[in-house]
Amino acid sequence: MGLPKLVCVFLFAACCCCRRAAGVPGEEKQPVPTPDLVEAEVGSTALLKCGPSRASGNFSQVDWFLIHKERQILIFRVHQGKGQREPGEYEHRLSLQDSVATLALSHVTPHDERMFLCKSKRPRLQDHYVELQVFKAPEEPTIQANVVGIHVDRQELREVATCVGRNGYPIPQVLWYKNSLPLQEEENRVHIQSSQIVESSGLYTLKSVLSARLVKEDKDAQFYCELSYRLPSGNHMKESKEVTVPVFYPAEKVWVEVEPVGLLKEGDHVTIRCLTDGNPQPHFTINKKDPSTGEMEEESTDENGLLSLEPAEKHHSGLYQCQSLDLETTITLSSDPLELLVNYVSDVQVNPTAPEVQEGESLTLTCEAESNQDLEFEWLRDKTGQLLGKGPVLQLNNVRREAGGRYLCMASVPRVPGLNRTQLVSVGIFGSPWMALKERKVWVQENAVLNLSCEASGHPQPTISWNVNGSATEWNPDPQTVVSTLNVLVTPELLETGAECTASNSLGSNTTTIVLKLVTLTTLIPDSSQTTGLSTLTVSPHTRANSTSTEKKLPQPESKGVVIVAVIVCTLVLAVLGAALYFFYKKGKLPCGRSGKQEITLPPTRKSEFVVEVKSDKLPEEMALLQGSNGDKRAPGDQGEKYIDLRH
């Protein structure tokens, strides 16, 4: 080959190399087209289309690739309209939808957020890229406040709270709020530090720590965090619960607090405590002014720093003061003195202390008491509670025996409800013993054990004796009254003689006779309310009008068993009589039902053996008292017994 030809070949080769190196317009590499964006939530199915939604063409012959590190990895083939999975991580999650142009990816995970390529074997169809974006809502955020507390005097930022949002994708955004207002980064005031952790599932766990310098006004501040995230459906957010953080600050003021609030009285349970406007509460001491020296002396308190007055008394009144010591700042504060007033009523005194008076004379009773408040006095009868008068003096004129007994003087403070004191005084009216009845009957059964009671009143206090043997017990309802109960066996001798109780004192005596009546089958007692038993009888002084003594009635002997026996016997007698009449009628000895009439002559009517005693336990309003030494006078209520005869 000649030299010219070699030169031409060399130049041609050089030109080709230069053209290849420099590039030729029209032969540049085609850029990657903008991919279609497909969004799906974790766990759902993503639909990947091989071309725009309105694109037309034959997609019966396509290949699907995964773009990974600029490499194309075949994952699925479509041949003649049928899908064929390729081995790999997507082998069991890919399938064709209704259209061969749509590839379905099931059970989407965060790892599926990649670029996919669809290549058609038809020359007219271009390569189509699909970008899959995956989303997952985080769980409800949790927040943990600083439980140790933050002191306002600290200059450095202290951790306020920590917010955690788990299992979200992509990483959510966190916002902090105080009292519903968003917090922003502020130098030397607010700092927010967030970090993320990638779980094995590909999801993110976000942790955000809020640090700040707090002030006293933040003691009740509400802090919470908010997570903002996006889903295919749009933007969303989740809020944590609100928390408060203990804020410590020194006290500026201390004061005394007393419970209960209001007027106090002796006997109340009173609690004295110290309080400040600081947090935490400092150490307290409670001092009380000594009235004799004028100095403040420390009082003994419990482990909580409380001074308990249980019960409150008069000497607890006085000036109290609190002192606080802040161990953090070593500052001592004192409260204003508080005057504690315990209202009281002193012991009540009645003069004379043991009054005695003759019947018909007058008596003056005086009541005295002391209090720091205005007093009111009231006089009452102890037994009945009857109000006799108001004022410190009670005047009794032309007294009778019924005026004897106990009187109550009550001194009260109207301004302080429940504050009062009382004193009893026993008034003695000289006189011989008196009783309600001269004679009383009681129905008994032979060989039964009977309790007989006898009551008498007088001044001096009488004594009671019995004319029969038995076990007697006594008790005194009041200084002028005595009640004696005799336990005795009912014998024929006792039925014949009865029982007598005699009350006597230095001024005379009085006697009540108890007549015992034996209950038999022929004795009926029609009204059990009049004679109510077989075991007990009470004989007591009768109460006059306006009297202050009360008659004590004990149960009387019962006769229900006897009445039942009598009814049964009568029923049996009637049954036998009816049977006899029926027998004679059947034998034809009775003219009943025949034409002949015969007169039946009855025997003469005889008096019934049944006697019913009608008794009354109620005595007249006014009854003459039985006078012992002045002669025996029958009580108006004892007018003899009334009988109703039952005849055939």
Swiss-Prot record:
Residues 24-131, 141-244 form the Ig-like V-type domain. It comes from the Eukaryota. Detected in melanoma cell lines. Keywords: Cell adhesion, Disulfide bond, Glycoprotein, Immunoglobulin domain, Membrane, Phosphoprotein, Repeat, Signal, Transmembrane, Transmembrane helix. It is found in: Membrane. Residues 1-23 form the signal peptide. Residues 532-549 have a biased composition (Polar residues). One of its GO terms (biological process) is positive regulation of cell migration. Plays a role in cell adhesion, and in cohesion of the endothelial monolayer at intercellular junctions in vascular tissue. Its expression may allow melanoma cells to interact with cellular elements of the vascular system, thereby enhancing hematogeneous tumor spread. Could be an adhesion molecule active in neural crest cells during embryonic development. Acts as a surface receptor that triggers tyrosine phosphorylation of FYN and PTK2/FAK1, and a transient increase in the intracellular calcium concentration. GO terms for cellular component: external side of plasma membrane; extracellular space; plasma membrane. The modification Phosphoserine is found at residues 608, 616. It is a single-pass type I membrane protein. Residues 585-648 are cytoplasmic. Pfam families: C2-set_2 (PF08205), I-set (PF07679), Ig_3 (PF13927), V-set (PF07686). Glycans are attached at residues 58, 510. Residues 631-648 have a biased composition (Basic and acidic residues). This is Cell surface glycoprotein MUC18. Disulfide bonds join 50-118, 163-225, 274-322, 367-409, 454-501. Residues 24-563 are extracellular. The keyword Cytoplasm does not apply. Coiled coil: none annotated. Its main location: membrane.
